[in-house]
Amino acid sequence: MQVLPPGSTGGPSRLFILRPVATTLLMAAILLAGIIGYRFLPVAALPEVDYPTIQVVTLYPGASPDVMTSAVTAPLERQFGQMSGLKQMSSQSSGGASVVTLQFQLTLPLDVAEQEVQAAINADTNLLPSDLPNPPIYSKVNPADPPIMTLAVTSNAMPMTQVEDMVETRVAQKISQVSGVGLVTLAGGQRPAVRVKLNAQAIAALGLTSETVRTAITGANVNSAKGSLDGPERAVTLSANDQMQSADEYRKLIIAYQNGAPVRLGDVATVEQGAENSWLGAWANQAPAIVMNVQRQPGANIIATADSIRQMLPQLTESLPKSVKVTVLSDRTTNIRASVRDTQFELMLAIALVVMIIYLFLRNIPATIIPGVAVPLSLIGTFAVMVFLDFSINNLTLMALTIATGFVVDDAIVVIENISRYIEKGEKPLAAALKGAGEIGFTIISLTFSLIAVLIPLLFMGDIVGRLFREFAVTLAVAILISAVVSLTLTPMMCARMLSQQSLRKQNRFSRACERMFDRVIASYGRGLAKVLNHPWLTLSVAFATLLLSVMLWIVIPKGFFPVQDNGIIQGTLQAPQSSSYASMAQRQRQVAERILQDPAVQSLTTFVGVDGANPTLNSARLQINLKPLDARDDRVQQVISRLQTAVATIPGVALYLQPTQDLTIDTQVSRTQYQFTLQATTLDALSHWVPKLQNALQSLPQLSEVSSDWQDRGLAAWVNVDRDSASRLGISMADVDNALYNAFGQRLISTIYTQANQYRVVLEHNTASTPGLAALETIRLTSRDGGTVPLSAIARIEQRFAPLSINHLDQFPVTTFSFNVPEGYSLGDAVQAILDTEKTLALPADITTQFQGSTLAFQAALGSTVWLIVAAVVAMYIVLGVLYESFIHPITILSTLPTAGVGALLALIIAGSELDIIAIIGIILLIGIVKKNAIMMINFALAAEREQGMSPRDAIFQACLLRFRPILMTTLAALLGALPLMLSTGVGAELRRPLGIAMVGGLLVSQVLTLFTTPVIYLLFDRLSLYVKSRFPRHKEEA
């Protein structure tokens, strides 16, 4: 077998060495394509990996959670459950609101999912309540995805109802039209309306009921077609004063006559301009506000979307009165841009460090310029390919390019070092370039394809993690491939034109000192290697111990999913007792806001109270805390969270749950804390039995903190127990009872006011100021068969009970979600294992199922596939090396270096206090590709020496180790310095980059020392083994 091509021909590099102009123009084309491509690449935090997600919201004011579940959510779920491509369906039914979240398979286009959802809603129309104020509204948005931008609209001169009306018609609609915007929500609920507050005593004294008033109002305010008159010469359109537009007009409405005298609405009710829902409120830095949350569509370019919004904001705000102020409270793209800038700086620093190492070893400016050109050319050329693949400039692709800095320079170094060796021996530069490039060409190809083989398994990772790292793997592979092309074309051509004996031998004092140092190091290495080769079994024992240590460290190291990022935004949930009213929650949020705004790291705060589809219950409030930029505060987000929770802990009757927002959102619902675990049953009764038991057990685990659940079954409910026989005798139906209660206490939307710009509601309710609580039920009167009025108490008893505040479903079955954080000193892997052990201890029945959700579920899937991923990388590399070497043995020798990389990486992570997460695992897989380079360079030269010079295997491997020591050391240090800026990263997004750098630097440091000694010993071991096999099983040639 001929491993290396003839050294004097130049191999694949010959044509490019002899045609410098063509080579230069080809490289210039690659450079130009990359520069143009860079300008077209979008900027993002991470690759787009969102599941196609659609949220369907139905509002039914006054309906209880039970009614919302049975009348609205269940019919919708049955229709949605028939859709193809649906991955998961979750729903939350609370007082007056139903929210169904549909998550589809990654392969299903969002537009197709949208059509399916619209068709399902249309098919379900006849099954939904006839008096729904509005049909179900769907939006292409993941509710768990934090808004890309939050704006607060305030005014010190106008009521919030007018402010919301202007914002909705002049601002929100325009922002909704921006490409990439999925949903614009107005938190604060101050939509203008005419509110009619009935005086129960007044209408009772007149013998009227709330139903009489409702009928009168709906009949007096209509907006329908009236036709037209078409005469011989003229056509006349018919119109009438059938609409009432203001509270004044409604106040004057005659609703009945008593003894011939008119009874006007103002006589029995307070009629005023107000808000459609008086139990909603939002505050920005404690000031009443309308808060606009802008959410993107799954898959949309967040940077482009935010830029478009900012460009149109000045024009939109000009259309508002001067007393209305629009403030951008948060913009996620600010941190995304800062993170990308920091990563770009680290990329530039890595290039500078790599070039510095090259100069330190070569000590020659022309020799340093050559790889100094090859590195940026390989990286810039990658941008052209990224454009065609629809990639983006994001943290992962920039990390890939930063790591590639150390990879791509390796090829150039190997070529330059080999050509320089021949020039120093007296060869002419052109002949040396042809001979050196031809001799090293196969090594370059081996290094390239074996390294790309390591990345192949990343391309086949499933689900969202696979999508996430596909851009990383492909970007790195493309950079490596372009580097190999550059190293076999441009690099030897430049060596032939720029290097000479004079330039290489020209030395100053620094050069001579470095040369003496390297000579001493190589001599020391030679003496050490000779001793190691004389004691092979001791070296093999060290190699075997390294393998065992790798396995042990893999078992004991804390495991996580994805680094927790500091993006400068904290999401919060404020929880109060289940019987809390809107007024008490508004008071509590004011107390909490005051404490939060006192923290020096907090820049702004928005809070929201009320049920609107996004916030499920009245006893909870949502918060968004925007921190100052990272360079303007002393603490990271986790320290700020701890400090805020301590500050709020002294406020009685509230629990505050906080979590930092993340760029990677896998969940489908807003959770109180970072991780979720669900308990599902076939009935609510089964859930109510097991939820307290499991929650108590989880709260006792030291591996979990801030454990809570969304199970709330202790809300106060007034049960109206109607005596049906008595009601029937009086001619009162259950529909009459429901209507009376709804008219009084449901903020019932009974009529619509149409204007040229918008539509507004008329809201009917009882004025309960003088009769609060259950006493208000005593004022309800119903119309009997004889036309008289009957108090509700005549046919019903009122009982106070407990009832759920919300009912949650997962795939149509009742479910409870437990939320938890992981305390310091424990990992997500520890928490997951503790929960699984608790499940076994409790011995849950067969009809109770549990499942991790969101990032915890993704962690389980990723952890289960990690070992197979590494095995697949090793197998892929073995296959490629076996094909290249036409040998079963030599690839094993090369792969024997891998355990050293694992030991170094795992030890470095443990010392640094980092978890073994997905980012660190990618670093270990990349180490597999880097570390085997040392063995490839040694073995290639040893095989050549055996074949061409007739040397013994021991002498050949000894000479190869000494000859390749300098390029091995140079390439390893280049790769190490390429990863060093990531390890030392401190800026925005550093949490994401640091584990990769730590794993690679640690792995390279340990493997560099060990592989220089273990590889030659293992090479000789397998050589002896090969000879033994050949002697025992000789191959007999058949004669023709």
Curated annotation (Swiss-Prot):
Q: Which domain of life is it from?
A: Bacteria
Disulfide pairings: none
Annotated membrane topology is:
Multi-pass membrane protein
Mainly resides where? membrane
Cross-referenced SUPFAM superfamilies? Multidrug efflux transporter AcrB pore domain, PN1, PN2, PC1 and PC2 subdomains, Multidrug efflux transporter AcrB TolC docking domain, DN and DC subdomains, Multidrug efflux transporter AcrB transmembrane domain
State one Pfam family annotation. Answer: ACR_tran
Q: How does it assemble?
A: Part of a tripartite efflux system composed of MdtA, MdtB and MdtC. MdtB forms a heteromultimer with MdtC.
PANTHER family assigned to the protein according to its UniProt record, in alphabetical order: MULTIDRUG RESISTANCE PROTEIN MDTB (PTHR32063:SF21), PTHR32063
Instruction: Tell me which family the UniProt entry assigns to this protein.
Output: Belongs to the resistance-nodulation-cell division (RND) (TC 2.A.6) family. MdtB subfamily.
NCBIfam families documented for this protein: PRK10503.1, RND_permease_2
Query: Any idea what this protein is called?
Result: Multidrug resistance protein MdtB
Origin species:
Salmonella gallinarum (strain 287/91 / NCTC 13346)
